[in-house]
Amino acid sequence: MKRNSRKTFVGKVVSDKMQKTITVVVDIYKKDPLYGKRVRQSKKFHVHDEEQVAKIGNLVNFMETRPLSKTKKFRLLKVLSHGKESEVRHSGETK
């Protein structure tokens, strides 16, 4: 797979408890087929962070790569901005 054809995403870090792995949540907006309203869906990805630079609340850019483990198929490109940890703790938690 060519490097330029790989998918890239922007998301917010919700967990950095694993070694060299972060959990990033990405919000995706889809249009409801019947009513036409935009509905927000979120999806979590496990992302490889070799230098362990990303912290909870950071906005990060990551890309698709070869499978690194059973659940990890993305790697961190760069940290776009630093956010507050308390914001993510409350808004990023799902049941």
Swiss-Prot record:
Whether Nucleotide-binding counts among this entry's keywords is no
- One annotated Gene Ontology cellular component of this protein: cytosolic small ribosomal subunit
Q: Which cysteines are joined by disulfide bonds?
A: none
Q: How does it assemble?
A: Part of the 30S ribosomal subunit.
What functional role does this protein have? One of the primary rRNA binding proteins, it binds specifically to the 5'-end of 16S ribosomal RNA.
The family classification in the record reads: Belongs to the universal ribosomal protein uS17 family.
Question: Which HAMAP family does its entry note?
Answer: Ribosomal_uS17_B
Protein name (database record): Small ribosomal subunit protein uS17
The lineage, from the top, is: Bacteria, Bacillati, Mycoplasmatota, Mollicutes, Acholeplasmatales
